[in-house]
Amino acid sequence: MNSNANKTPIAIGISQIFPCSYLEDQQEQLLVIQEETLDPILFERLLAIGFRRSGSAIYKPRCPRCSACQPIRLPVREFIPSKRQKRTLANNRDLTWRITSSQTDEQYTLYERYIRQRHFDGPMFPPSKEQYEQFLFCHWLPPTFIEVYANNKLIAVAVTDTLPNSLSAIYSYFDPDEAHRSLGVLLILIQCRLAKLQRKEFLYLGYQIDANRKMSYKRLYRPYQILTPQGWEYS
């Protein structure tokens, strides 16, 4: 498919209305890109107007009575870690991390433990290998895995899309027994550092949802930009 978004028409569909997986009292409806294959340049343009990826599906909330999902991104060259985030980095100096494009059984085993212990009340439970692959993998954009190790033991993974001018955080998970390390925070900080090293402009974090405690943490990384009807704005 031609990556020139100004000349290539894109087929977009709209889903049925169904119960929201983030806010109990709301209903959800999605705009869905109906293209089997995109390319990184076009996908990055879709990210910039609020779309996200789940597997090979590209979607954007268009809910009938709610606008709680706010696309959020970090301009990584301006990012300044908070005191708490600096402590997280300092407290995890004994850890090592590496980047790989390989999917491993060790990664999935860690994911399964994470979902069973941390998200047993959510839509991703019970975990399965098929669900894991459908959720994270995309045939036209292989993800990058950032693996974090403690004494050669895998304890955290961030799944990330690498795009021409940005990184996009898809999902992160970690060893529940190591929760005291604030590994979710650490993984975002590592992705931000990686984006800087690769001379990217943005790290996309998905949707900020203020009314959902598990989805409201992204405002802690500053400065950040929120996509509004007027465009991306610092908040």
Curated annotation (Swiss-Prot):
Catalytic activity: N-terminal L-glutamyl-[protein] + L-leucyl-tRNA(Leu) = N-terminal L-leucyl-L-glutamyl-[protein] + tRNA(Leu) + H(+); N-terminal L-aspartyl-[protein] + L-leucyl-tRNA(Leu) = N-terminal L-leucyl-L-aspartyl-[protein] + tRNA(Leu) + H(+)
EC number(s) given by UniProt: 2.3.2.29
SUPFAM superfamilies to which the protein is assigned, alphabetical: Acyl-CoA N-acyltransferases (Nat) (SSF55729)
GO biological process: ubiquitin-dependent protein catabolic process via the N-end rule pathway
Pfam families for this protein: ATE_C (PF04377), ATE_N (PF04376)
Keyword tags: Acyltransferase, Cytoplasm, Transferase
Regions that span the bilayer: none
The keyword Acetylation is annotated on this UniProt entry: no
Location in or out of the cell: Cytoplasm
GO molecular function, one term: arginyl-tRNA--protein transferase activity
A cellular component annotation (GO) from this entry: cytoplasm
HAMAP family xref list: Bpt
Role: Functions in the N-end rule pathway of protein degradation where it conjugates Leu from its aminoacyl-tRNA to the N-termini of proteins containing an N-terminal aspartate or glutamate.
Family statement drawn from the similarity comment of this UniProt entry: Belongs to the R-transferase family. Bpt subfamily.
Name of the protein this chain belongs to: Aspartate/glutamate leucyltransferase
Provenance organism: Shewanella putrefaciens (strain CN-32 / ATCC BAA-453)
Gene expressing this chain: bpt
